[in-house]
Curated annotation (Swiss-Prot):
Subcellular location, record wording: Cytoplasm
The keyword Lipid biosynthesis belongs to this UniProt entry's keyword annotation: yes
Full protein name: Acetyl-coenzyme A carboxylase carboxyl transferase subunit beta
Enzyme Commission (EC) number: 2.1.3.15
Lineage summary: Bacteria, Bacillati, Bacillota, Bacilli, Lactobacillales
Oligomeric and partner information: Acetyl-CoA carboxylase is a heterohexamer composed of biotin carboxyl carrier protein (AccB), biotin carboxylase (AccC) and two subunits each of ACCase subunit alpha (AccA) and ACCase subunit beta (AccD).
Listed GO CC annotations: acetyl-CoA carboxylase complex
Annotated CoA carboxyltransferase N-terminal domain residues: 21-271
UniProt main location, coarse: cytoplasm
Length: 271
């Protein structure tokens, strides 16, 4: 039996369809129309927050902003093969010079120092400029008597910068400690993914630690752990909800609720 032939009208309608009309949620695996994700880019089935750029998140979370240290640019200290090209690709994809945006912002009517790591820039990896901007964020917040809100998203330390990258863990942590010693609030918001050296340092040093639904949060990856202990891990291992049940974080907050939730926390701290 021969297959029916598509008419010219049907072919024209097919050609007129936009590309990437559907998108699959990486967590629940359900398919959705892209339009159904809304401006916040959230899965309508499980509320997983899709990975977004720092500038997109900034538009969702803050009503007034002033960027700090935007002129800092990463060099290539180890002359690592292909690194310059990766930096250029990250800059083109995000509009940032490195993997973090920092500055002063208003969230829910409350002024604070704000940092947003960008998973679209080399998976938000921690390099020298990212570490320097975060360090300056906490130092300026301490001087200005401001609380800090930091959205973490990272695959960990940036291997292309070697020991220069690893040093940022201690440097940022020292600035966080000085900010804490001044009696100021630090709210850490863990998004998908928050892994490696970022989790092992400043991401988990917040006075209040929040997370987005189903975010992957941990140090080593799942496969590495399973191969090390020779056991299969639970399905939701390293997910935000499991960390909440274990007491590692304080709350899981949906992306749409974050401006008001953070605004309330900041208002309570300054009252």
């Amino acid at each position: 039996m021969s297959q029916p032939q598509l008419t010219q009208e049907a072919l024209a309608r097919e050609a007129a369809l936009p590309e990437n009309l559907w998108i699959q949620c990486p967590y629940c695996k359900q398919g959705s129309y892209r339009e159904s994700l809304g401006n916040a880019q959230v899965c309508p089935h499980c509320h997983y927050g899709f990975r977004i750029t720092a500038k997109k998140r900034l538009s969702l979370i803050a009503t007034a902003t002033e960027e700090w240290d935007a002129d800092l640019v990463t060099s290539d200290p180890l002359d690592f093969p292909g690194y310059t090209e990766k930096l250029a690709a990250g800059q083109a994809a995000t509009g940032l010079k490195d993997s973090v945006w920092t500055g002063q912002a208003t969230i829910g009517g409350q002024s604070c120092a704000l940092g947003i790591m960008d998973p679209k820039f080399m998976m938000g990896s921690l390099g020298t400029v990212t570490g320097e901007r975060l360090t300056r964020l906490f130092e300026k917040a301490t001087s200005a008597n401001l609380a800090v809100v930091l959205f973490c998203a990272s695959g960990g330390a940036r291997m292309q910068e070697g020991i220069h990258s690893l040093m940022q863990m201690a440097k940022v942590s020292a600035a966080v400690k000085a900010h804490s010693n001044a009696g100021l609030l630090f709210i850490s918001v863990l998004t998908d993914p928050t892994m490696g050296g970022v989790t092992a340092s400043f991401a988990m040093q917040g006075d209040i630690t929040l997370a987005e639904p189903h975010s992957l949060i941990g140090f080593a990856g799942r496969r590495v752990i399973e191969q090390t202990i020779n056991q299969k891990l639970p399905q939701n291992f390293q997910r935000a909800e499991t960390l909440l049940q274990s007491g590692f974080i304080d709350a899981v907050v949906q992306r749409q609720d974050q401006p008001s939730y953070l605004g309330d926390l900041l208002a309570l701290h300054t009252a």
